[in-house]
Amino acid sequence: MIYENETHPPQVPRYHVTPDGAEIAIGQASFPKPFHIGLQYASPARGHWTIAHSPMLIPGCHEIYVCCACCLHGVVLSADEVPDGAGRFSMVTLTNENLIKGNLEEMMIDGISHIIDDMPERPKCVEGFTSCMQHFLHIDLHVVYDTLRQKYPDIDFIDGYMIPTLQRRFTPDILGRRQLVRAVQPLPKQKAVNYVVNYYPVDEDNELTVMLRQGGYAIHDFAACKTYEEYKAMGESQANIYFLENAGPAAKDMEKRLDQQALYLPYAYDYETLRRNLQQAAQILGLDLPDCDAYERAVEEKVRALKERVGDTHIAIDYTATPRPLGLAKFLLIHGFNVYAVYLDAISPDEKDTFQFLQTHYPDLSLRSTMHFKRRLLPRDDSRKYGKVLAIGQMAAYFTDTKYFVNLIENSGLYGYVGLLKLLDWIGRADEAENPKMRDIIQIKAWGCHG
């Protein structure tokens, strides 16, 4: 029998979706949440890192997830996609039987012990992850980790958390960064500082690093540690310098545990903040200031030359490229560049003044949600609409469908005046030629992560 739908196959429904709710001019936007995010869309631009990737920055650390099978699917795939990542990842499945019996502590101790005993080489550090279910049932993690530390005194254990439904105080990213430095213990103080907690090593050419080295300081960069001994050496530092707002709880936790001063020198694109960062570091750490005027003249010279090349090309920026997307937009706009869209879902408190400036002086700047459910259906055709779009960030490249893009993730180690100069060079190179591998690049999870 031939059915009706075989002779007349149903047509694929065509939807007409308006951008209302998913896009808004900054002049009409509210701070700090310009969008109501309910049902969320996840784009295939996946270069940003997650809690499955960041523990791999600790040399010799082995991740063990003790979770329900449904929760494990995502992290298993994330770890397996990373080069050599699967070898540093294990799992213990939480079952209904464990929930009914209430033996959560016993199964976690036995499961982690079994994995450690079967490993060909004993890890120096283990980060064990618990999920929401254990915490709903009040698992006693003190019993778990005290037992494991007594059983394996040669291993440092970190309590990791995959509890997105229990975000009472910290987001998963903030909590994950804090736990990454929990295995660092006090050591006799040396003339040294730490950079915490970035996912990319800080570029050594930047003026802050030069200042510190000229002042006789050793620098322990969390993301640049090659051995577990280098990671543990962070315990000897006098101060923790952090550039990301999300790294604040990690630095303050180390201040409390290790008696190391927390020093916030944020990423920035305005000269006032860049100069203030250096002045603060110089005052607290006893350093000589570099010639900030010379750096600012160099930036102005480079940005003028870049503007002549880029012209009125449409530019879009996204929040995965930089923690200060509005700050970067402001810098480019006041220098005459045609920034027309910024992709973000919320606005950092650090960018409140920048948000208000853009509201007043550039009210037509489009803010676009990356997670709003409409983003799945809205057209991604800006590169055809405007002729050419230059994207800064992977999500901006995907949503505008352009191959002219700067592959930047969380500033990619760029910092300060020197970082801004290098970013301008990257923008210039991206404007010169298409990257034919754009779609392949943006689908690689945790860009730059290696097991």
Predicted regions: what they are:
Residues 1-451:
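An N-terminal assembly and electron-transfer interface module characteristic of large anaerobic redox
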